[in-house]
């Protein structure tokens, strides 16, 4: 036993987390590694930092490994964000930077600020490139901190001088524009760019590129060393990136300064339509170069109604956008940009209350000195519906189905938004189902986290719309692997009001009830049982809704559910709750709305096969009177249901049957049924009425 103990004592002690961190930094500082080795080291650093942060959340007294990360270490990681690094390395470095800034807190923010301003003060092209690249990468990670650096009073004014030097570096310009592009996410930064950089951006966009410049720009290795060359014209890539920034500034205009009495409507030097035209030309060319920026730019430009119309009126462009999306990598900027374009093309304006409409008119009047009069007519429902049809015809649905399988929650939200808009058109719903939209929506609803509540509600509502207009047997039948019961929970989830909404929108509730009614009409006990188990309380609540359409939809659903023993028991049991439910159903059978009366009558027609329900009707004041009232309704369908209920009452066996016949006769049942027979034209109604009369009269004799 002594030998193993001695051997174990010779094993070197495990390295501390601090030592592991320093070793990783030593490898990263040394350089000369293959890209995959660098990525592996960056991933190891990211894990160490994330583990450190989580451990300190549990134990605040624990020391952080960030204490061994000095300025040189931070410099090392941030330099891997340089645009001259391979894209895969930059991606892993972004994750490491994010993990460090989260773990290091205020100290990390100070080191980032020191790094940025030190590089800018040095003022070489290399330093500018790294500083701009770091700012562009950290804007999405720490937007407030990066905006603070960007808005430093000495920083932006210096860019104009830098960009107008006689000797220019395309990489400096590109890095600067990438930073400005990222900065547009912040409203104060947009205002600053408008103030200090707009003329330079216009200058870049307005230049007429020659074939020589285009050819030079197509060679990615021409300036791979990042040095300076004399350029008479900016590269095409830079021109399109500048156009993207202008599109963001035009799409989200800056707020007017206080006391500014100038007209709020001023023509831009380069209009959003001009920029859209530039992006369109690039997208239509069979070149990958510049397409990413053009897609991003068009995503912002397509917020404008005129641009939306120009896109859908160009079939070649629409097909190209669908093709670009189909070929784009999941979770890529191109995917997100293309999806954003289709969201903008298909998005309907929200339905407003009268009060909200008046408030919007007042705001429009105030913001445009009386020169704008409400929403653009190109955004009305008619124009949006036409755009949706054109987008659908371009073949977008199968592409969305493919992207939904590997998308992030953000991109999945965009996919759902597009399907949601397409589902407004009843004529498209069956085709959407055929092309896989139902499974897309079901999987999306189940896979999205609870934090994405808005997207989940849209998915459920789009699902409801499709299931209202299609035969569930065709959607879920055959050899399909998605069971019909899978649709129940998403639909039930939108019956209650949206807790995040300021005003109640009844449409989701109505559409969910209608779709569930369609599902409950199928010969599927498991589905009906699932609806009863998960939604009964909510259905009962909606039966009493003040909105007639919602109430009717809920009663129609109950009419289908009472074919199920579990639902029958809810009415037939001799309990106070069952009696209350029956009283509600009888009240609805006497409702002003014919559809509600018909649905309630249908439910009673099924339920009165059971003694407990018959006893409940005859024991309730006006219970039989309501049923007889249905027998003389102006609607043949309602008369049929009323007579069916009366027939069930008077033909019941035993004591309850005798009580029912006595009650019906006492309420003038013979006279009512006679009138019903005279009033009806349907053989089924007349025959059933005669049978009920014979039973009553036979009992009387």
Name these PLM-found stretches.
Residues 339-399:
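Acidic, serine/threonine- and proline-enriched intrinsically disordered linkers and terminal tails
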Residues 34, 85-86, 123-124, 166-169, ...:
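Short inter-helical turns and helix N-cap capping residues of alpha-solenoid HEAT/ARM repeat scaffolds
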Residues 24, 28-29, 205-236, 325-334, ...:
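Acidic, Ser/Thr- and Gly/Pro-rich intrinsically disordered linkers and low-complexity segments
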Residues 24-29, 61-65, 69-84, 93-101, ...:
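Extended amphipathic alpha-helical scaffolding regions
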Residues 66-72, 106-115, 148-154, 191-199, ...:
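Short sequence/structural elements of tandem HEAT/ARM alpha-solenoid repeats
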Residues 24-28, 76-81, 112-120, 158-163, ...:
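Buried hydrophobic core positions in alpha-solenoid tandem helical repeats
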Residues 2-9, 39-59, 79, 88-104, ...:
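Alpha-helical solenoid repeat architecture
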Residues 526, 570, 615-616, 637-644, ...:
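C-terminal interaction modules of eukaryotic adaptor/scaffold proteins
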